[in-house]
Amino acid sequence: MTPFWISAFLDFAPDEFAAGVDHWRAGTGFGLSTTRGETGEFASLLPADGDDYLRVQRLGGGPSRIHLDLHVADVAEAVAAAVESGATVTGRPEGPDGYAVLASPGGFPFCLVTHRAAVRPTPAPWGGGAWVSTVDQVCLDIPPAVHDREVGFWSAVTGWEARPTSDEFTNLVRPGSSPLRLLLQRLDEPETGAVTAHLDLSSTDREAETARHVALGARVVARFDGWTVLAPPAGTAYCITARTPDPIDPEARS
């Protein structure tokens, strides 16, 4: 099982949906698709070029969160492979889309979908072209009790090599066509609990990008050598990292 594309879903609590969508439209520079779903609960953030990979959902209840969509050729085959690797199926909605809702061994929600996508968008320019930035990583925040199991699981269901960079972080080595990297972070605490996630941005000017997000209403929560943690006006916290955007393989855009 190897997904050909990965999308991140920003799932907002009902009272945070409008403000959350506005913040991420401004933060990414992306447009917004028409809404879809029975109550208009779904939409996609549309980059200036390439295929979309960030989507939004208004939840029926509960707190805001992130979940992943893994795009696969055959949902039934992918479900079988994911379950064999330790996933639990939590829903198989009726309808033409034929998607499946699952949870990882540590309880992180994800979906298997068949929507086609192939072209990774270029980073967005800011400050008159002085710097660029992009949302290019989902970091899974993993309690120690399930860390090793989650690393093995996500490497298996993506087919991406797990490459530890420290006791705290493990990178999954993405193919050049993927718009999102996956980073697995071992939390210090709590010892147990469900796996959660947050978005990470890369930029050619971390300080300027941080200031831009603060001007959009985000609040700086903490600064570290490799990243800055921000709390948006609505939704989950996210990070602006010290990484610069990875180059895009021209052949992957042909």
Region annotations inferred by a language model:
Residues 72-75, 203-207:
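Short proline/glycine-enriched turn/loop motifs at strand-loop junctions of beta-rich domains
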Residues 1-52, 77-78, 84, 90-100, ...:
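Core segments of cupin and vicinal oxygen chelate
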Residues 198-206, 212, 219-223, 229-248:
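C-terminal functional regions that serve as terminal interaction/effector modules
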Residues 66, 98-100, 108, 136, ...:
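Generic beta-strand structural signal
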Residues 1-21, 66, 113-152, 157, ...:
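N-terminal beta-strand motif that seeds the catalytic metal site of vicinal oxygen chelate
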Residues 28-64, 108-116, 160-195, 231-247:
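Conserved short beta-strand elements that form part of the metal-binding/catalytic scaffold
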Residues 71-76, 84-118:
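Hydrophobic, ordered structural segments
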